[in-house]
Swiss-Prot record:
Organism, as annotated: Herbaspirillum sp. (strain BH-1)
This enzyme's EC code(s): 3.5.1.-
Protein name per Swiss-Prot or TrEMBL: Triuret hydrolase TrtA
Alphabetical list of InterPro entries matching this protein: Isochorismatase-like_dom, Isochorismatase-like_hydrls, Isochorismatase-like_sf
Gene: trtA
Organism placement in taxonomy: Bacteria, Pseudomonadati, Pseudomonadota, Betaproteobacteria, Burkholderiales
Family: Belongs to the isochorismatase family.
Subunit structure: Homodimer.
Length: 227
């Protein structure tokens, strides 16, 4: 077992029963000129974590973990997007409308693609999710159960919305979740900090948190003991 120094207490897992879930590292959310910046958000906090997420992906791949990527996306006819969701945010630029990188949050559009430097490789799962949580209206739970996954490492954007929602969904389904705190981000840094505190309050009510460096140290120690 790999032991990681974490909050609120050490987290333990085995690579064979663990998946890395990278949430919504999409061009429209992270790049200048995308949907996120068109709504008036400062995308720099999200762009800043890209190297950390890339390093996390490398670690997971080298350790032999399952890697899962999610994209918040909808069918071109928006049949999986309720009216209540379409009306949220800036009413002049909504889901399905043509934005700077094609139709917003629609499958197959340029802005809906995962950043090239974080692109999935052969054998990794890509989950197109119509909601904020990675488990809602997807087959993610079935895919994880089929592979006997019990533990999840979680990263991505935004911390307070899709990352938190996915962790809570996973917790309700029995997964032990560790969020990599410097591999997540929000347009609002205070939201990021407070969400991490919420997830790990009361003895880890939803899960654990740790920086990438602690994860790397734990994996390196395990590898040294099990060459």
């Amino acid at each position: 077992m790999i032991r990681i120094d974490a909050t609120p207490y050490p987290y333990q897992f085995h690579p064979r029963s663990t998946a890395l879930v990278v949430i919504d590292m999409q061009r429209d959310f992270i790049e200048e000129g995308g949907f996120g910046s068109a709504l008036g958000n400062d995308v720099r906090p999200l762009a800043a974590i890209v190297p950390t997420v890339a390093a996390l992906l490398q670690l997971a791949r080298e350790a032999g973990m399952l890697v899962v990527h999610t994209r918040e996306s909808h069918l071109p006819d928006l049949s999986d997007c309720p009216r209540s969701k379409r009306l949220r945010g800036n009413p002049t630029l909504g889901i399905g409308d043509v934005g700077p990188m094609g139709r917003i949050l629609v499958q197959g559009e340029p802005g809906n693609q995962i950043l090239p430097q974080l692109a999935p490789v052969e054998g990794e799962l890509v989950i197109d999710k119509p909601g904020k949580g990675a488990f809602y209206a997807t087959d993610l739970h079935a895919q994880l159960q089929e592979r006997r996954i019990t533990h999840l490492l979680v990263a991505g954007v935004t911390t307070e919305v899709c990352v938190q929602t996915s962790m809570r969904e996973a917790n309700d389904r029995g997964y032990e979740c560790l969020v990599i705190e410097d591999a997540c981000a929000s347009y609002f840094p205070d939201f990021h900090r407070i969400t991490l505190e919420m997830l790990t309050a009361q003895g880890g009510i939803v899960g654990w948190r740790t920086p990438l460096a602690q994860l790397q140290a734990g994996v390196a120690a395990y590898t040294g003991e099990n060459p």
